[in-house]
């Protein structure tokens, strides 16, 4: 693979990952206590979890076309984040006894359902209303596509060296995981805590986050290229 193509693929994948993280609804510790909307965990942890699942499904398509690998990555990430949000909602509704609503919008932007009168006083919402669920699925898809693209590019580059198919796939997966974490953490710092999805005011920070991930991914791509073609492997 051409070194510039490898850097470009890693950069594009990193930007997709960083952008996708901004769509994922994360409420942190307050959400774990049903006092904020979103999944009760950290941004980087949830995004990385979905990304790792996407990388597993992408790796399962090794040897297929790049589009198939990226599609598999998207499906894996979407399933992981979707199941996580679904189970979370089941716990919020039937365990805690709260209605999935957001305190940051008067009505759900997608369904038009009123939110304010269902928000428990003293909280910022709870559960995952429709807009958060859809936003999370979009974020998972973007992250999965980005991770799949990075994996494919690294695997193609490593296959031309002394590695066998299994060795190339393993090293490519390790590299992809590292690059995924880099961009997930950068996006998490840009968000600065919790976010509900594309309807959250913090979502406006996505432009700055994409620029940061672009720069970091170019550096990561250049270092990866030096390692791959510089005689390390």
From Swiss-Prot:
Return the protein name: Tetrahydromethanopterin S-methyltransferase subunit D
Entry-linked Pfam families: MtrD
**What family classification does the UniProt entry report for this protein?**
Belongs to the MtrD family.
List the GO cellular component terms: cytoplasm; plasma membrane; vesicle membrane
- Provide the topology term for how it sits in the membrane: Multi-pass membrane protein
Chief subcellular location: membrane
Report which reactions are catalysed by this protein.
Answer: 5-methyl-5,6,7,8-tetrahydromethanopterin + coenzyme M + 2 Na(+)(in) = 5,6,7,8-tetrahydromethanopterin + methyl-coenzyme M + 2 Na(+)(out)
Which EC numbers characterise this protein's activity in its record? 7.2.1.4
InterPro entries according to UniProt: MeTrfase_D
Molecular function (Gene Ontology), one example: tetrahydromethanopterin S-methyltransferase activity
Task: Indicate yes or no for the key word Secreted.
Answer: no
Q: Which residues form the signal peptide?
A: none
**Pathway assignment:** One-carbon metabolism; methanogenesis from CO(2); methyl-coenzyme M from 5,10-methylene-5,6,7,8-tetrahydromethanopterin: step 2/2
In its UniProt record, which GO terms are filed under biological process? methanogenesis, from carbon dioxide; methylation; one-carbon metabolic process
Mind telling me which residue stretches traverse the membrane in this protein? 4-24, 39-59, 67-87, 133-153, 166-186, 209-229
User: Quaternary structure?
Assistant: The complex is composed of 8 subunits; MtrA, MtrB, MtrC, MtrD, MtrE, MtrF, MtrG and MtrH.
What functional role does this protein have? Answer: Part of a complex that catalyzes the formation of methyl-coenzyme M and tetrahydromethanopterin from coenzyme M and methyl-tetrahydromethanopterin. This is an energy-conserving, sodium-ion translocating step.
UniProt keywords (A-Z) are:
Cell membrane, Membrane, Methanogenesis, Methyltransferase, One-carbon metabolism, Transferase, Translocase, Transmembrane, Transmembrane helix
Protein localization:
Cell membrane
């Amino acid at each position: 693979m051409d070194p510039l193509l490898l850097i470009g693929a890693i950069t594009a994948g990193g930007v997709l990952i960083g952008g996708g993280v901004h769509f994922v609804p994360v409420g942190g510790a307050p959400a774990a206590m049903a006092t904020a909307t979103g999944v009760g965990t950290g941004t980087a942890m949830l995004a990385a979890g979905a990304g790792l699942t996407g990388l597993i499904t992408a790796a399962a398509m090794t040897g297929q076309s790049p589009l198939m690998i990226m599609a598999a990555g998207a499906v894996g990430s979407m399933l992981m984040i979707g199941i996580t949000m679904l189970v979370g909602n089941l716990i919020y509704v039937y365990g805690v006894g709260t209605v999935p609503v957001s305190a940051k919008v008067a009505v759900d932007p997608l369904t038009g359902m009123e939110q304010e009168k269902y928000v428990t006083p003293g909280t910022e919402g709870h559960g995952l209303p429709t807009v958060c669920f859809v936003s999370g699925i979009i974020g998972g898809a973007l992250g999965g596509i980005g991770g799949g693209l990075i994996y494919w590019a690294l695997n193609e580059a490593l296959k031309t060296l002394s590695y066998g198919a299994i060795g190339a796939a393993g090293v490519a997966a390790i590299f992809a995981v590292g690059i995924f974490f880099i961009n997930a953490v950068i996006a998490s710092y840009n968000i600065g805590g919790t976010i509900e999805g594309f309807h959250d005011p913090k979502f406006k920070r996505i432009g700055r986050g994409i620029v940061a991930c672009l720069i970091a991914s170019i550096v990561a791509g250049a270092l990866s290229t030096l390692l791959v073609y510089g005689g390390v492997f």
